[in-house]
Amino acid sequence: NFNYGEILEKKPIGFPQDGGKLKPYSNLFYWAHAWTPGTKSTIGLHPHQGFEICSFVLKGNINHFDTKQNKWIPLKEGDVQIIRSGNGISHAEEIDDNSEIFQIWFDPDLSKSLKKEATYDDYSSKDFKLIDKGNRSFKVIVGEGSPMHMDSEDVCINEHYLSEGNHSFDIGKDLIHSYFIIDGEIILDKKKLERGTFFTVSSENEVVFKSSETTKIFEIISPLTPSYRTYSQLR
């Protein structure tokens, strides 16, 4: 936790020293699910370099400050920001009371990114197109038709909204699909997976499951083996 418990978090992928369910894989380096159970809380100015750092507002509001913008920028539920931290940037973030975010770090090939100037972009929820598939729909956050640009190789990010019933996701060849259940629950391989569950799927043609209620699932698709050596491979 941060700030004496004002910010609580679980880390599907954590830093080596603080423990995560998994070590870095693909070009995913770090993934934190963070929330404020009560009062708002601020994480003060701190530096980053090399990585692409994305924040996804799942609930409530956050405020972002960095040394490129030099001002506080508000973001609300459904909004996304990306810091391409390049050769260095410092930022601070304030998470409002009863708010919830993902912060996810991607490795864009540090041998190249560390030579670039840092850049920042934020995107409103309405910038992302919603595709209706009948008993489910999904929002394309990174991928075809999305305005959000990432340097990290072959990354797609979707948010799925599923009605009760049977569903399947296609699994791409040479890709790993990382899933986090934001709301609801599913039955997968006869096991109940509840809100807050993180899992990955690869080397399959599809994943078939049943949603026992209205469910929201966050998906990141990334290469099983990036074409470059990642930071975690070099350490």
Regions from the PLM with identified roles:
Residues 146-200:
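Hydrophobic secondary-structure block in the mid-to-C-terminal portion of proteins
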Residues 47-63, 105-109, 160-163, 172-187:
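Short, conserved beta-strand element in jelly-roll/cupin
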Residues 43-44, 61-63, 80-82, 86-93, ...:
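Histidine-centered metal-chelating micro-motifs
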Residues 66-84, 172, 187-211:
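Short acidic-glycine-tyrosine-enriched beta hairpin
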Residues 85-112, 202-231:
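Ligand-binding loop in jelly-roll beta-barrel domains
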Residues 2-45, 50-53, 101, 128-168:
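A short glycine-rich, His/Asp/Glu-containing loop-to-beta-strand
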Residues 53-108:
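Contiguous mid-protein beta-loop-alpha structural module that forms a pocket-lining wall or clamp
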Residues 82, 92-150:
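Surface-exposed beta-loop interaction hotspot
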